[in-house]
């Protein structure tokens, strides 16, 4: 299949990219993304963290565990099912480094985001996902422009693909300390879950086919959290 081969070639090119190292933006290239041909969901994050730099798997640290819990709340049978059905990438493909205080990660430099943008654009063109899950302010702004999380989370935008914004699952974020914002998160997860329920078995089968046989899964409805 031409699209599948094009995706594999694109992924190989991304893994070998070292443009930001050559330009002195970062000291080490560690492009991180994950996904299969046919995935109906596409999640866009900000940038890998230090855990992801080592594992080379998106959202594999503490924030990723929280994201997995959110997706089970949304209606995926398990975190594994969520990741089978979702292509996960970021605005910046490599770890941007720690901040000077050592208590958090640097925001992706605009030049690095610009360097990486063609990877994201090509993935979206090839995969044609049905739903984009936008995690964090930077990813949301990339597709929807500047705006407050309060005005974005809990709503859907565009069609197709439908875009659903989420806050970042980092434990450093205080946004979810507000009960009203937790309700917004629940509403956003419900939108994701409603779409999950509409997926035909054939769509799930196609997204599973690149990684070996999988048993069929049932979707759960969103729960309050």
What are these regions (language model features)?
Residues 1-199:
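A polyanion-binding, active-site-adjacent surface
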Residues 211-212, 225:
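Residue-identity detector for glycine
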